[in-house]
Swiss-Prot record:
Enzyme Commission code(s) on record: 2.7.1.170
Catalytic reaction equation(s): 1,6-anhydro-N-acetyl-beta-muramate + ATP + H2O = N-acetyl-D-muramate 6-phosphate + ADP + H(+)
Positions that bind ATP: G9, T10, S11, V12, D13, G14, I15, D16
Residues annotated as transmembrane: none
SUPFAM superfamilies found in the cross-reference section: Actin-like ATPase domain
Protein name stated in the entry: Anhydro-N-acetylmuramic acid kinase
């Protein structure tokens, strides 16, 4: 089956669209990436999404209009992908997260805009959306949802692997070797903290919005991290919170960054030193989470997501783990690091119509496996 996966993460960089050929049943699947592109949001829409993520209030009418505008962009991305790579049979659309609140004595909340019924109508393709709601309703975090896909596509027969996503938020999937008895039951994953979000927000602050991100981490690489300040930031409660755990821009967002800026100003750090310190903090949140919560450190780490293109961040991650644990890209495993999340939601959509649960209770904290996603059929 030819399935489109659509994904826009917390960085709001654009809509990643992957056309994937999927064969097999349940966990015995094979995939082939047929085509991939990133559809850029119209600039005004991106600005609106970021403003809402930062807390801008909307009326009910404005909220509904934004939902429809995002759905139109997702449908456009799916149509453009098919014009280039051929017709699909199914769409799995993650949508655009604008708010995520983990469970805290009550059910968690996670809002993804870009309603699936509108995408189905505009593309004339069956569409699966709202993947997080069933897990949240069962009492889980609703995130991360990719670890089960990672397990069946990227686990190694003999090596312990970590798949580290560096989107706006960072998250890890730990994969034990497949030669271990009941290895699937030992797959774990959680959000590690910030990925690109603080680095991107910092660049936007320093350039008054003229620059969206630090290409290759060049600006940050010109500075020196202030290690005492980094350690102070690492004392944040989320870093040492036991998994299952998830987070978003609501936590690691503008307010968090402004406190980091005030801290840097108090120490009279240069802009480059501040960026270097934020990069070091991001790298060490990953290392600290592994050290605290993995059953053992991995034999190898594979990166995916936008942060994979930040050469300086990759360098600092490698330094954090030393020479004993290689830090590479999922490209080395034959899985495009930019397309990986979109591929995952294509697989989750395929699993949904095959009635195969897509969550891992040990990862999300849900009490049981559940079917992920709501199915919308065009008329």
């Amino acid at each position: 089956m030819r399935v489109i996966g659509l994904m826009s993460g917390t960085s709001v960089d654009g809509i990643d669209a992957a056309l994937v050929e999927i064969q097999g049943e349940a966990d015995a699947i094979e995939i082939e990436l047929l085509g991939f592109t990133t559809y850029s949001y119209p600039s005004k829409l991106r600005e609106k999404i970021l403003a809402v993520c930062a807390g801008e209030k909307l009326s009910a009418l404005e909220f509904a209009a934004l939902d429809d505008e995002i759905a139109h962009s997702f449908a456009t991305a799916a149509r453009q992908l098919q014009e280039r790579y051929g017709k699909a049979e199914l769409i799995g659309s993650h949508g655009q997260t604008i708010f995520h609140r983990p469970p805290n004595g009550n059910l968690g909340l996670s809002w993804q805009l870009g309603r699936g019924e509108a995408i189905a109508q505009q593309t004339k393709l069956k569409t699966v959306s709202n993947f997080r709601r069933a897990d949240l309703a069962a009492g889980g975090q609703g995130a991360p949802l990719v670890p089960k896909v990672d397990a069946y596509l990227l686990a190694d027969p003999t090596k312990h692997r970590c798949i580290q996503n560096l989107g706006g938020i960072g998250n890890v999937t730990y994969l034990p070797p497949k030669n271990q008895t009941d290895w699937e039951n030992y797959v774990i994953g959680w959000d590690t903290g910030p990925g690109n979000v603080l680095l991107d927000l910092a660049i936007q602050k320093l350039t008054n919005g003229a620059q969206a991100y630090d290409q290759d981490g060049i600006w940050a690489s010109q500075g020196t991290p202030h290690l005492d300040l980094v350690e102070r930031w690492l004392a944040d409660p989320f870093i040492e919170q036991l998994p299952p755990k998830s987070t978003g821009r609501e936590y690691f967002g503008v307010d968090f960054l402004e406190q980091c800026w005030r801290d840097a100003q108090d120490l009279q750090l240069s802009e480059a030193d501040w960026l270097a310190s934020l990069t070091e903090f991001t790298a060490l949140t990953v290392q600290r989470n592994y050290e605290l919560f993995l059953p053992q450190l991995p034999d190898e780490i594979f990166l995916c997501g936008g942060g994979c293109r930040n050469s300086y961040l990759r360098k600092r991650l490698q330094a954090a783990f030393g020479n004993q644990i290689p830090v590479r890209s999922t490209d080395d495993l034959g899985l495009n690091h930019d397309a990986k999340e979109a591929i995952a939601f294509a697989v989750l959509a395929y699993w949904r119509i095959k009635e195969f649960p897509g969550n891992l209770p040990k990862v999300t904290g849900a009490p049981c496996p559940v079917l992920l996603g709501e199915i919308h059929c065009p008329y």
